[in-house]
C-alpha cells in the first residue's frame, strides 16, 4: 500500500487509521443533517427478492412458464418486423410500452456489476438475478446481430405516450430505429459493449459458451463504437429526445466500455486504450452523478480497482478521481444536497435513480478500499470504508421507509408504499381479469382516477419524494411516481450486501 501513497498521505493515513470504525473525521467536517426516523430493522432479504422480481413485470415478449409476476402476459411478439428483424424480448424501460436500448443496456451493466461484486451473497436469489440479466442480454444479442448496425429502439415514443394501454394491448406503431456507420451511436454501442462484457463475467462459470458469445459480441460492438464516433441522438433526435438523449456525449461510454472489456478480457489492448484515450474521453472531468447517461464516475470506480487491487500503477489517477466523487457526495460537502429527512437529492425527476446508483458505488468502493487496506481522502481528511457503508445504508433505509413519511418507496415492501404508480400495466386490470382489449384512449379514465393500481408491480422503486421529503402518490406525477429498470438495477447489489450484513 505504501508504494502508492505520497509521504504526506501515508502520514495522514497512519494518523487516522484508528478511526476506521467511525469514518469521516476532520476539524473542517460539518455536522450531519440527517434526522433519525425510528423503525424496526429492515428486511433487506425480502427487499432484495422483490427488487429482482420487479424485472419480471417489465418483460416484453413471450413470457416463460416460470413467470412469477402472473398478472403480466405476452406482448410485443412482432417487435422488429418493421425492418424484418427479430427484436422480441427485452424490457420496457419504465411505465410505458417503449423499448429504449440505451437505458436497457445500462440496466444490464448494473445488474451484472451487482452480481459481480455481491452475487456471492445473494444465495437463493442468484438464479433469479441471472435470469433478469439473461432476459436483457438475449435481446441485446439480437439487437447487435447485424454487422456495423445496432437496433437501438422499438416503438414510437410520442405515439406511445399519447396512449394509456396495457403492453398486451398496444396498437401503437412498433417502429424500429437503428444506428450504423453512416449514423453512428458510440454512446449506446459503448454501453451495450459494457453490458455484454459485464454479463460475460456473470456467466463465465455457469455457462461458459454463452459467456464467450457475450464477450465476443462485446468486442465487436466496442470496435464499432470506437471506429464510427458520434452520439446516437444526433441522428435520432426526434425519436430519442428528450426521453433518452445522450446529454453527456459519447466519450464516457467509450471509457466505460473499454473499462469493462479490460475487466472481462484482461487484454492489454484495452488497458493501453484507456491509458492513451482516458484524458480525451473525459477521465479527469469532474462529475458527481452516475446514471444511464453519464458513466464517468462508474468508470473511475471500476478502474480504481485495477490500481487498488491489481496494482496497475498507471491507473492511480482513477483512484484519485474516485476519491473526488466520494468527497462530493458526503453529507456536508458543498457540492452535495440532502433533503431535511436525509435523502441524497440530485434533481426533481426520478431522483431515486441517483440514490440507488450512488449507494451501490459507495458500497463497491468500500469493498475495494477494504481489500486494499486503505481509505479515501478528502483534502486533509480521511473517509473510511465504514463511513461509506454507513452513508449507503442510510440511503437504502430511507428508500425502504426510514423517512419522515414512514413510507417505503418500493412497491410491495412494508405496509405503506406507493399505490398509484405511473405504470400502464400496473394501473389497468390484467388480461386475466379483463380479457377485452383496452383501447389507446380508454385507459385514461383509470389513469386519472384516484383508485389504487389493481396490480402491484412488486419491487418497483419509484422516482421518490421531492426536496422537502414530500410524496403525493399521484399517477400523473411521472417524475416521482414512475418506476424504471435503471433505478432498481444498482439497488440489487446494495441490497445483496445489506442482506448479508
UniProtKB/Swiss-Prot annotation:
Its principal location?
secreted
Question: Per the UniProt record, which EC number(s) apply here?
Answer: 3.2.1.4
Tell me where the signal peptide lies: 1-29
In terms of Gene3D superfamilies, this protein maps to: 1.50.10.10
Using the UniProt record, name the top-level EC class of this enzyme in a single word: hydrolase
Q: Which gene encodes it?
A: CEL2
Q: How is this protein named in the record?
A: Endoglucanase 1
State where the protein is found: Secreted
Task: Report any Pfam family annotated for this entry.
Answer: Glyco_hydro_9
Catalyzed reactions: Endohydrolysis of (1->4)-beta-D-glucosidic linkages in cellulose, lichenin and cereal beta-D-glucans
The species is Arabidopsis thaliana
* GO biological process terms held by the UniProt record: cell wall organization; cellulose catabolic process; pattern specification process; response to nematode
Q: Does the keyword Cell wall biogenesis/degradation apply?
A: yes
Which cellular component terms (GO) are annotated to the entry?
extracellular region
Report the domain of life of the source organism: Eukaryota
